[in-house]
Amino acid sequence: MNNRMKEAADSVLTNTVAESGGAPGVVAMVTDKRANFYEGTAGVREMGKTKPIATDSVFAIFSCTKALTGTTLMQLVEEGLVSLDDPARDYVPDIAEIQVLDGFDSNGQPKLRAPKSDITINQLMLHTAGFGYEFFSHDDLAFRTARETASVVSSTYDGIKSVLLHDPGECWMYGVNLDWVGKIVEAVRGKRLGEVMQERIFNPLGMTDSAFTLTPAMRSRLASLHTRAEDGQLAPWDLVLPQPPEMDMGGHGLYGTVPDYMKFIRMILNDGEGPDARVLNKETVEKMSRNGLVGLQSGGWTTSMPALSNSGEFFPGLKKSWGYTFQINDEPTPSGRPAGQIMWAGLANLFYWIDRQNGIGGMWASQILPFKDISSY
């Protein structure tokens, strides 16, 4: 990257922090197949304090976790230990007990029925199993309230044993599916998901700052979460996911740094090859990057908890699909991303994209709630 382009990129970060109500701190990086060619930071780790945010600052990466969990599942597929068409109940019998929400009675109590078919691993990977999130579904939130079901952020198994909002395979709906995928990986490997990731992703890629449980070194570099009030003002929020978690949440539980995530992105850009070992076969990466939905499209989300997320959609009006497990832009975007580019995000306004066609990818990381915060767009 030449100096002019670096200055332009740096100014985006600086302006994001400097503007009224802007992000307290941001880290952004861009990589090609070989190495990062842009690294930028601006701001502080916590609003009201002076310690600057740095390239090695640790973030709660939330749903950026999903791609790594999906990778551990696809490794099982490569080894012939599972098939995407397998019923999930074969590995996690508890999932067969989850029923479909069929409305509420006059007392606000859920009316439930059995699903019309078993949930498959494929449906979990593609977000078509029927699960939602309490902060993206009024019905899911009402069910949890009526049944006093734990929140998904409790990092407990009970937090994902909620309800199906539609029958398996009926439509695309973003939800706790990858948490169940993580349970499948644990059942097959006989280890916690974090151990599997450590052995099969983090070690081969040299990702030394990624974990479900913060190490003392990671905690010393942790960037604070912040919340934006209705008046637009930001304030630090002293929230850390349960340490250690009862369950390694495959949908949202990882902490990590941007440099670590760039190593994962480079592995995908290099068709599964890491600097010291192969993590995935080329054919697997190609499958992960292709649409797996049949007759369905992925879309946006509607908030049911405005403190955690705004309503929104990535690239509204453009056709989008879902792979294993990324969103895919099926059409070129106004910002110049080609059709077939894969991407996703994390709840605290973290965003990543992987352009395999042109061999580049990047990440933008902040720690602000609600999702789709104005300072991150």
What does each of the following model-derived ranges do?
Residues 2-61, 81-83, 97-106, 239, ...:
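Short, conserved catalytic-motif segment at the N-terminal edge
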Residues 5, 9, 61, 65, ...:
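Hydrophobic (often cysteine-bearing) scaffold residues that line and stabilize catalytic clefts
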Residues 8-14, 28, 34, 60-91, ...:
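Active-site SXXK
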Residues 36-37, 234, 361:
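Hydrophobic "anchor" residues
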Residues 40, 352-353, 359-369:
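Short, well-ordered beta-strand elements
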Residues 90-336:
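Short, surface-exposed loop or secondary-structure junction motifs
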Residues 341, 348-357:
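Short, surface-exposed beta-strand/loop micro-motifs that present aromatic residues
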Residues 368-377:
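Generic C-terminus detector
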